[in-house]
């Protein structure tokens, strides 16, 4: 029997709001990280590029983990 947690679709996870942390990199540019998704981070020269890339990284992280059948954590506020 599948419970509600197991029945969640990839689209469900893609619509969740995972908090993003952005900070300046000591070598220049910015680093963005989603702490709820282990290893989901990116580095770019501008804040705009950093935001765009962390959103792409989040989607790829979620798609990969979902396809592997692993547990996806929910966002922590």
Positions of PLM-derived features:
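Short, charged, surface-exposed hinge/linker loops at domain edges
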Residues: 1-19, 23, 52-77
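Short aromatic-glycine-(Arg/Gly/Cys) micro-motifs in beta-strand/loop hairpins
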Residues: 22-37
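Gly/Ser/Thr-rich beta-alpha loop segments that engage phosphate groups in nucleotides
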Residues: 31, 41, 71
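A short, exposed loop/beta-hairpin motif centered on an aromatic-Gly-Thr core
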Residues: 38-48
